[in-house]
Amino acid sequence: MIKLFCGSMYSGKSESLIRDLIKCTYAKKKILFIRPYMDDRGYITHSRNDSKVIKAINEKKIECIYIKEFDNTTINDIIKEKYDVIFIDEFFMIKNNRNFLETLLICKTNTDVYYAGLIADSDAHMFDEAIQILPLCDEIEKLNGVCTKCGSMLGNYSYHLGIKENQIEVGDVKYECVCGKCFFGDER
């Protein structure tokens, strides 16, 4: 199974990923947790489950790696380990996700893969990594946050505060969650 949790900033994507990861630890699954090398925020989510996962990683109950891309060496190393389930947070910051998934499927590994991350940038343009994996996903859960401008429960846009220099800029303080009305309306 390949599952994607997507949505805007502050919609609970990573928290949903961590919730399922914790369930898999109870089931004693062999787990790999993958994070992008460029995400240096020092935490996974803003929830209290964050400490449970960090503790499990520190106690070696969950293996955690940081990568820039799924190159052939990384993919082969992952396949050799025969993980039951792989969790990938902020997948859009990691290159070659499709190649990774196709290799898992071709090798018939029976490994479940859970993704979490944005599918679009703060200009509402799809990330290439999202476009590449969407057709391969068995399940997609799109989450909404709360609009910081009007309070709508349909906050599904990540609005960048200030001048944006790159398509991806790591840092929660640079963004806020807004609804479509505020994203495309006079508020902007």
Model regions: which residues?
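Residue-level preference for the first positions of well-ordered beta-strands
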Residues: 2-4, 30-32, 84-87, 112-114
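Conserved P-loop
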Residues: 1-74, 121-132, 142-145, 157, ...
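Sensor-1/coupling segment of RecA-like P-loop NTPase cores
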Residues: 106-129
